[in-house]
Structures are given as structure tokens and as C-alpha cells.
Regions:
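N-terminal subdomain of nucleotide-sugar transferases
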Residues: 1-31, 103-106, 187, 241-251
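A conserved catalytic-core segment of Leloir-type glycosyltransferases
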Residues: 8-81
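Acceptor-binding helix/loop patch of EC 2.4 sugar-transfer enzymes
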Residues: 35, 44-56, 109-156
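Short N-terminal targeting/anchoring amphipathic segment
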Residues: 71-92, 105-112
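A short, active-site helix/loop in glycosyltransferases that binds the activated sugar's phosphate group
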Residues: 118-123, 143-191, 196-206
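Nucleotide-sugar donor-binding and catalytic loop/hinge architecture
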Residues: 204-221, 252
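Conserved donor-binding/catalytic core segment of Leloir-type glycosyltransferases
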Residues: 215-234, 240-244
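Nucleotide-activated donor-binding/catalytic signature segment of Leloir-type glycosyltransferases, i.e.
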Residues: 250-282
Length: 282
């Protein structure tokens, strides 16, 4: 989305990814190899070991101990500005990020979760240890004073010392949390909401849209979406509770309502709603 917008404004831009899912020539995939698969597996093995060989939150944390050195790639050497996004699970290691910093190129890092300014977690929940020093991580099976969250936090702190990175949050909420972290203290932290291509996403004829999506014409529809509906952080439980309150307080009105849900595992919640649910199965 950002790349296309930049290109439309006359700026040359390329997107470097671990796994390419488009045929656009401006999207460049890292070279396929079994080494990439092993990097992903090895990071999980290290986390699994640090987690006392428990699967607890095995994919909820990342330590960035494996990755690819991109600084020798032509896409990197030709670039004037490096814009990082979500770089985990074998894309870039902390060592690779250090190489990027040492290149001297201006760096912008758009944060899509909390990982850039915490030890190992993507969402800290009620934990605020990232504000000073991660340790006794609640997302580990048995955290300790110098657990893997502590050690990764220390590595990141050394990594960011002397670096000049502009951290961009996609929401004011994430910006406010980032500014609390001692990890990126002194760095530029700002907020730029996710852009929307209004040439593509724009008001259209409602009747035609419902026909195309096989949705009823005679109901008022609520829309809820998440990559994984069962992820408690996304708020599906709040929506179910609110819908039940509506059905209880306004039984006649609730007959006119329906819920459109896009995201994985939407069908699991169908029986919990007091009125029809229409899974889009994104």
C-alpha cells in the first residue's frame, strides 16, 4: 500500500519480503532456501528451551536470533531510506539490524505491535516492565530475573545506543506505549495512521455490495474483523456481550440485526451470538 502510493508520487520504491505473495516486480523475495526454514525453526527451538521445553506462548514471542543480512543486496545499496516493518520469525536478526544501522542510511521503523520496544513480546498486556527493564517475563512458562526477555532487552538496548531511528506507530495508543519504553528513549517516536487507498476503498452501492457478498438486504449489519477471531485481544467477547445486551434490552430491534465477520475461525463464535452471523472467511 505504501509502496504503491510512493510510486504514484514519483518515488522509486521496492519492498523486500521473506515470502512473496504477489507477481509485482517491485516486490522482491529473499532467496528461497532450506536455510530460511531452519532459521525459523531454530528461533523456536531456542525459545522452547528457554521456556523449559513448554509450548506456552511459543509463537507469542520473538528473540530475533536468526535472519538474513540484506545490506549487500542491490535493493539495499541502491536505497536512500530504509523503512522497516514487521521483521520477525527469520526475516531480520538483531545482528542484521545492527548492520543496517551501521550502514548510515536513514531508518524509519513502522511498529505494527510492541516488539520493537519490548524484550520479546508483541503485546505486553498488563505488564509494564518494558518501561524500564524486561525480566520475569509473564509470557514465559517460568520467567526469571535474567530470563531470555531480560537478555534480549539488553541486546536491543545496546543495539539502539547511538542509533538514530524514527519509530512510527500506527495508532496513538501504540505511540503512547512506545514513549514509555526505556529501550528507545531519546529516539524520534511519532504516529502515522495506516493509509487507505480511497481510489479502491470508497462508498459503493450498498444493494449491489450485499448481493455480491451474499448478505441479506433487510438487516442492519454490524461488521467485525480480525486475522484470528479467537484472539482475545481483538475484542470478539466484548462484541458478543454487547449483542446479547441489545437482544435482551431491545428484542424487537435485535430481529433486524446481523453480524458480518471476516477473519479465521469465525464459525466458532456463530452459536454465541443472539442473531445471525455471516462469516466472510478471510
Amino acid at each position: 500500500r505504501l509502496m504503491e502510493s510512493l510510486k504514484n508520487h514519483g518515488i522509486k520504491a521496492k519492498l523486500l519480503v521473506r515470502d512473496k505473495q504477489t507477481d509485482q516486480i517491485s516486490v522482491v523475495e529473499l532467496k528461497k532456501s532450506w536455510w530460511k526454514v531452519w532459521q525459523f525453526i531454530w528461533e523456536r527451538v531456542v525459545i522452547w528451551q528457554a521456556n523449559h521445553f513448554k509450548k506456552h506462548n511459543l509463537f507469542a514471542v520473538d528473540i530475533a536470533n536468526t535472519g538474513t543480512n540484506i545490506t549487500a543486496l542491490p535493493e539495499f545499496t541502491q536505497a536512500d531510506v530504509i523503512h522497516l516493518h514487521w521483521i520477525n520469525q527469520g526475516m531480520l536478526s538483531l545482528t542484521d539490524i545492527r548492520r543496517i544501522i551501521q550502514s548510515g542510511k536513514p531508518i524509519v521503523w513502522t511498529m505494527h505491535d510492541m516488539w520493537p520496544f519490548t524484550g520479546i513480546c508483541h503485546y505486553a498486556g498488563d505488564c509494564d516492565k518494558y518501561a524500564t527493564q524486561c525480566h520475569n517475563c509473564p509470557q514465559l512458562y517460568k520467567g526469571s530475573r535474567k530470563d531470555i526477555a531480560y537478555r534480549t532487552f539488553q541486546k536491543k538496548k545496546k543495539l539502539f545506543e547511538g542509533a538514530q531511528i524514527t519509530f512510527v506507530a500506527c495508532s496513538r495508543w501504540l505511540e503512547s506505549l512506545a514513549k514509555k519504553s526505556d529501550l528507545i528513549k531519546g529516539q524520534t517516536i511519532t504516529n502515522i495512521p495506516n493509509a487507505i487507498n480511497t481510489n479502491l476503498f470508497k462508498p459503493r452501492d450498498k444493494k449491489q455490495a450485499r448481493e455480491k457478498c451474499h448478505l441479506p438486504q433487510d438487516k442492519k449489519l454490524l461488521l467485525f474483523g480480525s486475522v484470528k477471531i479467537t484472539d482475545k485481544r481483538k475484542g470478539i467477547d466484548y462484541l458478543v456481550s454487547a449483542c446479547k445486551q441489545i437482544a435482551s434490552s431491545y428484542p424487537d430491534f435485535s430481529k433486524e440485526l446481523g453480524v458480518v465477520v471476516f477473519g479465521n475461525q469465525a464459525e466458532q463464535y456463530a452459536s454465541l451470538f443472539p442473531f445471525p452471523i455471516y462469516p466472510m472467511n478471510y
